[in-house]
């Protein structure tokens, strides 16, 4: 799984500001004092190789009328994960860019990471998390890591002919509520040079989604990128990918089983005109999510020459 990412839209801020200043005239303004709320976004990712397991926790908060200067730093918090058999480890404080790419928040928050101790956590384990805040408050939650699964009949590296689609299937993961299908494609700008299709990102990251625990089939690459299709300039590339990948590119493909907590926090619920409403899985003196995932991946080389490598199965 990739780092947690928060994106802030200056355009949205401008629209809201313009609406307030010019869209209406208010005769009376009531200021409501907003309490400080700590938000914890905690994820534990289990990979094929236990050495690749990682846990991340990002703590931030809504700021009340007192402002951040009146509050103890969240970097003084302690984040502990405990398996039901008593095995326990504490996450280590790290720079915030280990948890997210950028932050629009007045207070950037606090990031905690653990890698080596997480190697002992496996699919199906029940893990509890405890966040101890510098104020003395506690935030708690628990998750059962999705069960083990495998990608069917695809080796860790395979060769795919140009302009060819391949069917990716996998076994079901118990406790999974959905699957994230991701790919990172390298070499597209050069491979499509002169085709009239402009690609600026290299690698190009595309995301697909299987929305239930039994939805275990996806077509590569045509069914990846469902969240990119409304991105400016992506339409031509999306049509091109319906026929497969061009000669010379490489791709990393992954399927990640995600738990109930992850799905509820990501999807929120039904459409809300006022914005996304997230469903938390943490409680106590704060709110947030404790999500667990299990990932599987393989690499694809697009070529007419196998060079002794196994061919990617097409179905």
Q: Each PLM stretch: what is its role?
A:
Residues 24-315:
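A sequence/structural signal for flexible, mid-protein segments enriched
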């Amino acid at each position: 799984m990739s780092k947690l990412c928060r994106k802030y839209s200056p355009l949205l801020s401008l629209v809201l500001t313009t609406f307030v200043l010019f869209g209406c005239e208010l005769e009376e303004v009531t200021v409501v004092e907003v309490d400080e709320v700590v938000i914890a976004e905690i994820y534990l990712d289990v990979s094929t190789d236990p050495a690749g397991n990682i846990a991340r926790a990002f703590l931030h908060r809504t700021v009340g009328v007192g402002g951040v200067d009146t509050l103890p730093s969240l970097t003084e918090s302690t984040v502990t994960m405990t398996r039901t058999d008593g095995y326990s480890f504490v996450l280590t404080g790290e720079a915030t860019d280990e948890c997210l790419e950028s932050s629009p928040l007045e207070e950037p928050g606090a990031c905690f990471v653990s890698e080596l101790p997480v190697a002992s956590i496996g699919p199906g384990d029940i893990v509890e998390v405890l966040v101890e805040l510098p104020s003395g408050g506690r935030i708690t939650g628990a998750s059962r890591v999705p069960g083990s699964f495998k990608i069917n009949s695809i080796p860790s590296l395979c060769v795919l002919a140009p302009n060819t689609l391949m069917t990716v299937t996998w076994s079901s993961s118990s406790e999974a509520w959905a699957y994230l299908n991701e790919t990172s494609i390298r070499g597209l700008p050069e491979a499509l040079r002169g085709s009239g299709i402009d690609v600026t990102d290299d690698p190009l990251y595309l995301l697909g989604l299987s929305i239930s625990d039994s939805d275990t089939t996806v077509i590569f690459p045509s069914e990846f990128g469902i969240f990119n299709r409304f991105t400016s300039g992506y339409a031509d590339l999306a049509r091109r990918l319906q026929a497969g990948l061009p000669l010379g590119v490489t791709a990393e493909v992954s399927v990640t089983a995600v738990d109930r907590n992850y799905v509820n926090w990501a999807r929120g619920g039904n459409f809300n005109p006022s914005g996304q409403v997230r469903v938390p899985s943490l409680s106590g003196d704060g709110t947030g999510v404790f999500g667990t995932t299990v990932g599987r991946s393989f690499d694809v080389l697009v070529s007419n020459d196998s060079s002794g490598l196994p061919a990617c199965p097409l179905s």
